[in-house]
Amino acid sequence: MAKPEFHIFICAQNRPAGHPRGSCGAKGAEGVYNAFAQVLIQKNLTNRIALTTTGCLGPCQAGANVLIYPGAVMYSWVEPADAAIIVEQHLLGGEPYADKLTPAEIW
């Protein structure tokens, strides 16, 4: 793969049940990753946009979290249905998806 135009990082951190910070893994990160992967495949974008799981991105209380570079744009409370919107609106359209942007007070 050549240098990607965008890189999507999906937090997939897991912690034990009852951990005070929770985890994106327990908040559906696997489904979010799979949804992004399917959108990239369907739109033939896998050669332009990299998709990677990562450890903790910080705002665990707001998971599942997604971080996109360039621009360091963080999305929180992301659900699988948001993947298509984020790809279409942000990555292809150039406008971040305001409904899921991580609030400044937590990141």
Curated annotation (Swiss-Prot):
<keyword id="KW-0813">Transport</keyword>
<comment type="similarity">
    <text>Belongs to the 2Fe2S Shethna-type ferredoxin family.</text>
</comment>
<dbReference type="InterPro" id="IPR048111">
    <property type="entry name" value="Fdxn_Azotob-type"/>
</dbReference>
<feature type="binding site">
    <location>
        <position position="56"/>
    </location>
    <ligand>
        <name>[2Fe-2S] cluster</name>
    </ligand>
</feature>
<dbReference type="GO" id="GO:0051537">
    <property type="term" value="F:2 iron, 2 sulfur cluster binding"/>
</dbReference>
<comment type="function">
    <text>Ferredoxins are iron-sulfur proteins that transfer electrons in a wide variety of metabolic reactions. Might be involved in nitrogen fixation.</text>
</comment>
<keyword id="KW-0249">Electron transport</keyword>
<keyword id="KW-0001">2Fe-2S</keyword>
<keyword id="KW-0535">Nitrogen fixation</keyword>
<dbReference type="GO" id="GO:0046872">
    <property type="term" value="F:metal ion binding"/>
</dbReference>
<protein>
    <recommendedName>
        <fullName>Ferredoxin, 2Fe-2s</fullName>
    </recommendedName>
</protein>
<keyword id="KW-0408">Iron</keyword>
<feature type="binding site">
    <location>
        <position position="24"/>
    </location>
    <ligand>
        <name>[2Fe-2S] cluster</name>
    </ligand>
</feature>
<dbReference type="GO" id="GO:0009399">
    <property type="term" value="P:nitrogen fixation"/>
</dbReference>
<dbReference type="InterPro" id="IPR036249">
    <property type="entry name" value="Thioredoxin-like_sf"/>
</dbReference>
<keyword id="KW-0411">Iron-sulfur</keyword>
<feature type="binding site">
    <location>
        <position position="60"/>
    </location>
    <ligand>
        <name>[2Fe-2S] cluster</name>
    </ligand>
</feature>
<feature type="binding site">
    <location>
        <position position="11"/>
    </location>
    <ligand>
        <name>[2Fe-2S] cluster</name>
    </ligand>
</feature>
<comment type="subunit">
    <text>Homodimer.</text>
</comment>
<keyword id="KW-0479">Metal-binding</keyword>
